[in-house]
């Protein structure tokens, strides 16, 4: 029997002899700051994830239903076709517009995330690279969410749904980057574990809040998800230790090729293709 040699993690501080107590951004957090990093990213994963799940699973399908005259807040409500006087076939009536909304959102998100990632890396402010994006993204998400909650047509709904993909990327992408930048290798497993727990709790909480909200009226889920979005970016910044200024970092010109490179699959990587195919099939089955 033989023991396989583990593949080295080329980004690990243990490999290149960097101090594992120092983060990538050069900071050495104190014990209190490590605790704030842990609970800050845990709270952020709940605050950012819960409203997003509530929108995707409950609020937006109900907005589609309301657009086509079906009020899910009224028990036993059946939409009547004014032309024939007969009940509308709800499932077949709503399946296609909901599918269009989902596809539009996926395509927009595919471009939004790498774009925001590149722009965030090049942000130079006294507040740091990630803080302005998280605060601004949360507030912008709240504003767009309130617009989506209005009784608007399917075309306008799709347009603002695209806007929300970019706004949510402004909130979520810098948060993910902050974990890799601000957490030293020594504490990364623990903080990432709590972040994962927060993601699961946020998903469960989002579904529950969406289901409870729609019991009152179809706008209620949009109102409290907007509040959560507005709070999420601000609360995360307040809980986490202050991000160091990026104003002194060298400026980098925006290069669109860096955005496009993130959309290209890695060459000569069959393992990636298999994992990508498996992930796609899994998500298609869940969806």
Please report, for each region that a protein language model flagged, where it lies by residue.
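Cytoplasmic helix-loop-helix junction between adjacent transmembrane helices
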Residues: 166-198
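Cytoplasmic membrane-interface "Motif A"-like loop-to-helix N-cap segments
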Residues: 122-137
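Glycine-rich segments within core transmembrane alpha-helices of 12-TM secondary carriers
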Residues: 109, 189-214
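Hydrophobic core of transmembrane alpha-helices in multi-pass small-molecule transporters
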Residues: 46-47, 144-145, 154-171
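Symmetry-related core transmembrane helices of the 12-TM Major Facilitator Superfamily/SLC fold
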Residues: 220-238
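C-terminal ends and interior cores of transmembrane alpha-helices
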Residues: 135-152
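Juxtamembrane intracellular "pre-TM" segments in multi-pass secondary transporters
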Residues: 9-35, 243-278
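Helix-loop boundary and gating motifs at the non-cytosolic
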Residues: 19-106, 273-278, 282-287
């Amino acid at each position: 029997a033989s023991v396989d040699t583990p593949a080295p993690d080329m980004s690990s501080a243990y490999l290149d002899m960097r101090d594992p107590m120092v983060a990538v951004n050069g900071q050495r957090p104190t014990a209190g700051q490590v605790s704030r990093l842990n609970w800050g990213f845990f709270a952020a994963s709940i605050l950012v994830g819960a409203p997003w799940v509530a929108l995707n699973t409950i609020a937006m399908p109900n907005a589609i239903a309301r657009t086509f005259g079906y009020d899910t807040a009224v028990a036993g409500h059946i939409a009547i076709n004014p032309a024939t006087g007969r009940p509308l076939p709800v499932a077949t009536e709503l399946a296609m517009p909901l599918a269009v909304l989902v596809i539009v959102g996926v395509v927009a998100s595919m471009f939004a995330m790498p774009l925001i990632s590149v722009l965030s890396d090049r942000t130079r402010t006294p507040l740091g690279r990630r803080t302005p994006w998280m605060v601004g993204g949360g507030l912008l998400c709240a504003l767009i969410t309130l617009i989506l909650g209005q009784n608007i047509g399917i075309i306008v709904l799709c347009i603002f749904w695209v806007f929300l993909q970019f706004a949510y990327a402004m909130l979520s992408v810098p948060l993910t980057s902050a974990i890799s930048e601000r957490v030293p290798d020594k504490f990364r497993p623990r903080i990432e574990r709590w972040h994962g727990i927060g993601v699961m709790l946020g998903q469960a909480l989002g579904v529950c809040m969406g289901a409870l909200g729609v019991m009152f009226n179809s706008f209620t889920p949009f109102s409290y998800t907007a509040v959560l979005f507005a709070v999420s970016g601000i609360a995360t910044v307040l809980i986490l230790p202050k991000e160091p200024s990026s104003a002194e970092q060298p400026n980098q010109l925006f290069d669109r090729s860096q955005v496009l490179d993130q959309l290209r699959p890695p060459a000569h990587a069959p393992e990636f293709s298999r994992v990508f195919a498996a992930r796609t099939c899994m998500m298609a089955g869940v969806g």
